[in-house]
Swiss-Prot record:
This is Peptidyl-tRNA hydrolase. GO terms for biological process: protein quality control for misfolded or incompletely synthesized proteins; rescue of stalled ribosome. Keywords: Cytoplasm, Hydrolase, RNA-binding, tRNA-binding. SUPFAM superfamilies: Peptidyl-tRNA hydrolase-like.
Amino acid sequence: MNISGLIIGLGNPGREYDRTRHNFGFMFIDALLEEAQRNPFARCEQLSGGKKKYDLWRCDIVEGQAPWLLAKPQTFMNLSGEAVLAIASFYRVKPAAMVVAHDELDLPLGRMRFKMGGGNAGHNGLKSITQCLGTPDFHRLRLGIGKPPAGGETTGWVLGRFSQSDTAMVDAVLEAAIQGIRTFATEGDVAATQYINAFRP
């Protein structure tokens, strides 16, 4: 199968986690799928759903380019690497051709960062992927969620839902992130990093 790469959105499966901050990666994959389905020239098909480890689609992200695989691990966050390794092994995707979208406490809502490699910054999904792949050398799309208010507890914050007042900001970030991934697909790391890191809502 000819593919351009693999985009993974991190999150937890189940309705109780829908639109929580920790599921920002899932929301990004959903936004990519919705965008592809609105484009009459884009092909998008589900390759697996309801499997134990992952939901997977093959979609056109850029016209005239080989499709990308879009994945939502269904293993829960701390075991995300098991799903990523299973996909990478079956479809022969190298870590350098992967982008992992995830929530980022160290960035405020409305800000993003794109980078290749690096540490896990305490993110268990990234830690699992690094361990399973045996390398940290994959791209990360860090989607800011901000830190809890003073005295707030981190777990409750990341597992809490975005507020109604956050909706416009979240939508703007997702729209810009899609353009950022298209820039990565067509122009590479440097252009994507410049676009994504400079984004202001």
